[in-house]
Amino acid sequence: MKRNDWSMKPDEFHLTVLGVLKRPDGRYLITQRKLDKEWGAGWWEVPGGGVNAGEDSRDAVIREIREETGIDVSQAAGGYAFSYKRVNPEEKNNYFVDIYKFILDFVDNDVKVQPEEVEGFKIATLEEVQAFAKEGIFLHYDSMKEVFD
């Protein structure tokens, strides 16, 4: 489905998840969107995506992180942080986002990106994440910045 191809009614919402992965040294795993994406091409983000019917958000974020990065966070410290809501009546795309934060020790070689979705990745400092956000090329940062500490 292409972005902006939704047909939701004003009172309908879908659920998405985002997963912040932080190493004990304070660095974060961020991914770069494919350069051929219709929306946000080449921008930075954290792993995430839609929750499937019958799936709870924790299972969805574990699945999305594993699909996009190859990392299994099912036994990692951390978990649910908070949720936010977006209402976009013009786009007919209303959604809730559940934000998760996991603490896990991993190295570059542990990351196996999903080539259909992810252009690349970076083990970034908080300052690097904030710099991408200031440039306007880090998706959802303003809605989730409190989970980066």
Placement of each model-derived feature along the sequence:
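Acidic, metal-coordinating catalytic segment for phosphate/diphosphate chemistry
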Residues: 1-18
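Nudix hydrolase/Nudix homology domain
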Residues: 4, 37, 80-149
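A generic structural micro-feature
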Residues: 9-13, 40-43, 91-96
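A residue-level structural signature of the nucleotidyltransferase/glycosyltransferase Rossmann-like core
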Residues: 11-12, 28, 43, 110, ...
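Conserved Nudix-box catalytic region and its N-terminal flanking loop in Nudix hydrolases
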Residues: 27-68
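A short coil-to-beta-strand element that immediately follows conserved catalytic motifs
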Residues: 72-82
